[in-house]
Amino acid sequence: MQFEVKDLINKIKKDGLDEAERLASEIILNAKQEAEAIILKAESEAKELKIKAEKEAYDYKRYSLEASRQAFRDLVIGTENSIKSLFKSALKDSVSSVYDSNFLRELIIRVLDVWGKDDKIDIMLNESDIDNLSSILKTSIRNKFGAEIEIKPFKGINKGFKVQQRDGSLYYDFTSEAIADILFEYLNPRFKEIIKLD
């Protein structure tokens, strides 16, 4: 019986040890699997974070470059517009300087020479030019055209004049502003080539 008890104790020990080893192996295996899953999850999250960070960096770089390009375009357009404005102002001043009393008188007479003699015409000048030219123009014009032409002051004119039929059907603008605008439009393509920054 002693051997049976001893065998029974040994068997219980062996079964307990086997069970403990099996449980330990199972715990170790589960721990390894959990560790591998945690590592895989961490690697996957790290990869996603890296991809997200790279995309954000790329987007930031792209947006920064686009903002820089837009700022440069705005600067070029602003500079071009400033230069155009200066050029247009200088052109207007240049045209205005030509419009002295003698030039205006000659130009008005030449414009009226090609106008129909039966038309009723209004000539509009600024007030200072009317004071300087009124008597000379009235004498020159009335000799050719009679009373069909009136000379009127017009506050909106700096230099130059406007001519229109009294019924308003035909109108010509010979003001320094209008002539400068026409010249600027004519010169603008050439001007653009000169200041082209490409």
Curated annotation (Swiss-Prot):
Q: Which SUPFAM superfamilies match?
A: V-type ATPase subunit E-like
What is a GO molecular function of this protein? proton-transporting ATPase activity, rotational mechanism
* A biological process term (GO) from this entry: proton motive force-driven plasma membrane ATP synthesis
**This protein's record includes keyword Protein transport:** no
Give coiled-coil spans as residue ranges: none
Q: Does the keyword Transport apply?
A: yes
Q: Name one GO cellular component term.
A: proton-transporting two-sector ATPase complex, catalytic domain
Keyword tags: ATP synthesis, Hydrogen ion transport, Ion transport, Transport
| Biological function | Produces ATP from ADP in the presence of a proton gradient across the membrane.
Q: Which HAMAP family match?
A: ATP_synth_E_arch (MF_00311)
Q: What name does UniProt use for this protein?
A: V-type proton ATPase subunit E
User: Whose protein is this, by species?
Assistant: Borrelia recurrentis (strain A1)
Source organism phylogeny: Bacteria, Pseudomonadati, Spirochaetota, Spirochaetia, Spirochaetales
Q: Which gene encodes it?
A: atpE
